[in-house]
């Protein structure tokens, strides 16, 4: 009875503000978590993690199999056979590393060891993960470890087969790092306090990607009979502690950890609100119900493998952004001040260069109750640091990637009718972001003087910075126009045409240009650029991949090529010419097209906008067949905070937001036979692919609510009104 009550209570919480959803939505009859495999993407370049978390939660408690080097951005590789321990925070699918806070490791036997001698082998057959739950049995320790989570707290359950010196290592020096030197020097300060024989509190400040402060409270279900600190290396400031317990063989020790950015009292309040007791099964059941309350918003027909791919994508997309404010709405902002979040919740982990493309459009459609909170968080941070977040993490800015696609995310929300934020504040943040230069990422004086970022005056990524900034200018113009700001709209609309200044008609590429107006030479359109390693004028890409980065004005881009035929000929070459140089995060290749990296994600849909929708439909099927699978290596590139997953979901339904701010989803071809989207206010939108098969991959015709539909896109407004979209599939082009 208790489990049922927790299940229903959590469903209510998960659906709060998701106004009056359908009865089926409120009490899902299907356990959709059965179709989620958290191990998908946990091998090779996917960089996902298999541990326990809640939708948009602050906590992601997960195993660590490594922490040094790019392959361990999520601290886990599926092929590894040694577990270092379990940390409480993780990034999902990123190409850079941070978090990995508070490593804990249960063990038995000798307690005094070197810091790296507490690790244990494990059998893959003992490892299992579902949304909100992870378990594994540690061979040397002979401990069964189980993890579950709430929004702000992790709950661990360790069953000790042996009771000889049953202990837990608590490592506050640990965290993912680029190299061994950084691993042993990333902590700037660390304080801990044993408040009683079962409670440890503390504060850690560290720096890998951002300057991070976290406060914690850790409690144990058994009294600690002895504890001591391990010696630290010369560059280390993070403490490592060992806590021991007096238990019998087969007995359990539970441990709960709550985090806060504001202080120990904030962490204690979070724990008291979310994990007041030791009901592991209750929290686990509530976590499952929480995930079901979201996953049930889309009903999918298809094979079990297809459902696994789809619902795992749904799961990955909802791991972030993360609610890092306390239960009372307070958080530590970018100026290190503790403040109240506008709207009561502050979110971070905004991988905006990735997620503005499809993940945020997906949130506006399927998680609309969170969108205003995301926008308020972006604007709150902008008012502290004077520009919208570029890549927001733990409430701070890490300056990763180019341009500032917080502009797009804010403008898209406004264009789609979201009004739970102050539009004047939001537009002021956009205007300041796009006009006031700041270190590292924007020199608007050069941009306005030349109409592009000159390669000789820009350290790296000049072409990508121009093209990506142009899209944000378009987004700013769109919001200004909708708000009646005529002068601002005209100003940003003029800048939105700057992409034309980098098009070299002789080569038909977007090409780096110098401040004197001449093209940079020599020029190799296949040469991959990467600011942090090889430099160059492109961001994790090349001229072949970035020439198509004009999401807001495809007709204008086609005109630069001289019409649809030369445009399509060049686009054909993209998918057939072999890439000459490689980069770790430029993957999922079909010719020069790189599905494993975000600038390519809209490109297949350009065929549909240039009069050849059948080629879009062929390529979507090829990408589904070759770049996604329900396996640990089933993602061809970094999931990038759910963007790879969001592309899959949109494309599976048969459309994609080429230009997110426009609110238009360009048609491709559906890959599963039926979807039912449970929208806000009890509405449903049904998508059917009649006649879909391996051969029938082309769309013959479309109807919307029984009427013939001839547009090459469907609008966000039409979807959220509810209705039925039917594709008639055929094997004929």
Question: Where do the language-model regions lie?
Answer:
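Accessory carbohydrate-recognition regions in carbohydrate-active enzymes
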Residues: 25-360, 364-408, 414-467, 478-501, ...
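Short acidic, glycine-rich surface-loop motifs adjacent to enzyme active sites
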Residues: 475
């Amino acid at each position: 009875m208790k489990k049922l009550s927790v299940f229903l209570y959590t469903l209510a919480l998960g659906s709060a503000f998701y106004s009056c959803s359908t009865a089926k939505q409120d009490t899902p009859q299907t356990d959709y978590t059965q179709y989620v495999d958290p191990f998908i993407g946990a091998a090779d370049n996917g960089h996902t993690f298999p541990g326990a978390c809640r939708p948009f939660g602050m906590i992601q408690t997960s195993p660590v199999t490594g922490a040094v080097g790019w392959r361990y951005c999520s601290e886990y590789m599926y092929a590894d056979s040694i577990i270092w321990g379990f940390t409480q925070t993780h990034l999902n699918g990123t190409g850079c590393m941070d978090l990995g806070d508070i490593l804990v490791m249960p063990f038995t036997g000798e307690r005094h060891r070197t810091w790296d001698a507490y690790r244990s082998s494990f059998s893959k057959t003992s490892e299992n993960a579902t949304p909100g739950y992870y378990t594994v049995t540690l061979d040397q320790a002979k401990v069964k470890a189980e993890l579950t989570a709430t929004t702000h707290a992790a709950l661990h359950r360790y069953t000790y087969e042996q009771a000889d010196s049953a202990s837990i290592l608590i490592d506050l020096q640990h965290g993912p790092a680029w190299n061994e030197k950084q691993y042993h020097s990333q902590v700037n300060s660390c304080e801990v306090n044993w408040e009683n024989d079962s409670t440890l509190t503390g504060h850690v400040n560290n720096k890998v990607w951002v300057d991070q402060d976290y406060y914690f409270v850790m409690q144990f279900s058994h009294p600690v009979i002895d504890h001591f600190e391990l010696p630290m290396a010369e560059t280390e400031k993070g403490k490592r502690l060992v806590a021991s317990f007096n238990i019998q063989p087969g007995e359990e020790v539970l441990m709960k950890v709550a985090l806060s950015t504001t202080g120990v009292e904030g962490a204690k309040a979070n724990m008291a609100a979310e994990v007041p007791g030791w009901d592991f099964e209750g929290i686990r059941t509530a976590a499952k119900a929480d995930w079901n309350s979201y996953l049930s918003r889309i009903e999918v027909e298809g094979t079990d493998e297809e459902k696994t791919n789809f619902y795992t994508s749904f799961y990955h997309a909802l791991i972030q952004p993360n609610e890092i404010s306390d239960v009372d709405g307070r958080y530590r902002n970018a100026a290190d001040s503790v403040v109240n979040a506008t709207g009561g919740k502050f979110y971070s982990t905004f991988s905006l260069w990735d997620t503005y493309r499809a993940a945020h459009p997906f949130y506006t459609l399927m998680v609309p109750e969170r969108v205003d909170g995301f926008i308020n968080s972006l604007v709150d941070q902008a008012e502290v640091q004077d520009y919208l977040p570029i890549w927001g993490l733990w409430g701070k800015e890490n300056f990763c990637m180019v341009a500032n696609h917080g502009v797009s995310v804010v403008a898209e929300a406004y264009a789609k009718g979201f009004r739970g934020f102050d539009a004047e504040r939001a537009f002021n943040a956009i205007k300041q972001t796009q006009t006031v230069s700041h270190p590292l990422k924007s020199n608007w004086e050069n941009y306005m003087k030349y109409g592009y970022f000159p390669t000789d005056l820009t350290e790296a990524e000049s072409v990508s910075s121009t093209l990506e900034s142009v899209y944000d200018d378009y987004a700013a113009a769109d919001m200004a126009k909708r708000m009646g700001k005529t002068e601002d709209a005209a100003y940003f609309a003029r800048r939105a045409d700057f992409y034309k200044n980098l098009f070299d008609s002789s080569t038909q590429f977007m090409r780096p240009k110098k401040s004197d107006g001449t093209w940079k030479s020599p020029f190799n359109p296949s040469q991959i650029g990467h600011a942090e390693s090889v430099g160059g004028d492109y961001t994790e890409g090349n001229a072949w991949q970035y020439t198509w980065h004009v999401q807001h004005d495809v007709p204008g881009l086609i005109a630069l090529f001289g019409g649809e035929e030369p445009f399509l000929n060049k686009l054909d070459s993209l998918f057939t010419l072999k890439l000459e140089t490689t980069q770790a995060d430029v993957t999922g290749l079909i010719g020069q097209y790189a599905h494993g990296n975000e600038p390519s994600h809209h490109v297949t849909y350009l065929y549909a906008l240039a009069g050849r929708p059948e080629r879009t439909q062929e390529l979507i099927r090829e990408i589904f067949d070759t770049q996604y699978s329900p396996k640990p290596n089933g993602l061809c590139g970094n999931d990038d905070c759910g963007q790879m997953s969001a592309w899959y979901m949109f494309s599976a339904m048969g459309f994609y937001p080429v230009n997110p701010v426009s609110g238009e989803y360009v048609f491709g071809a559906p890959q599963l036979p039926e979807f039912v989207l449970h929208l806000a206010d009890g509405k449903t939108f049904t998508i059917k692919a009649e006649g879909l098969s391996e051969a029938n991959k082309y769309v013959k015709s479309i109807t919307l609510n029984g009427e013939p539909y001839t547009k090459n896109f469907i609008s966000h407004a039409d979807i959220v009104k509810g209705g039925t979209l039917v594709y008639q599939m055929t094997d004929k082009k």
